[in-house]
Design a protein with these regions (language model features):
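Thiamine diphosphate
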Residues: 1-141
Length: 141
């Protein structure tokens, strides 16, 4: 397990200073910690596509953005990601929680299909991705 403050510290040392996204119960510790931090900014978004657009603006304004949302909202982010982020090679760190776990962990039925196709969708969008680190040692690699 990685504590939110440890993740934020490591990300800050890599230059990430602005967080954006939509509410997600799995991301609540990261969202709350980024909102409470004196050295970070958190900009709430009304949907996942807007979060990607906000991240682009943060980068163009000199910041380093982190976008956070559930994979169930990845579909909302496809167009701004492919037509803006990819086209203009804007670097962002995206954290998408995995709902509808493909390993058949119980979840809500509306998440099942997106859970199955999330990694394939990221590959189709030519997004470099990896699983979130499970502990602090993995985080610092």
């Amino acid at each position: 397990m990685i504590y939110a403050d440890k993740f934020l510290d490591e990300a800050f040392h890599l230059g990430f200073n602005t967080y954006t996204g939509v509410p997600c119960s799995f991301l609540k510790p990261l969202i709350n910690a980024s909102m409470e931090s004196d050295r970070l900014s958190y900009i709430p978004a009304v949907n996942e596509g807007d979060a990607v657009g906000i991240a682009a603006g943060v980068y163009l304004g000199g910041g380093m953005p982190v976008v956070m949302f559930q994979n169930s909202g990845l579909g909302n982010a496809v167009n701004p990601f492919t037509s803006l982020i990819q086209t203009f090679e804007i670097p962002i760190l995206m954290i998408a929680t995995l709902r509808g776990d493909p390993e058949n962990e119980p979840d809500e039925p509306q998440h099942q299909l997106m859970g199955k196709i999330t990694t394939q969708l990221l590959d189709l969008m030519q997004v470099s991705w990896s699983w979130f680190p499970e502990n602090h040692d993995e985080l610092t690699k």
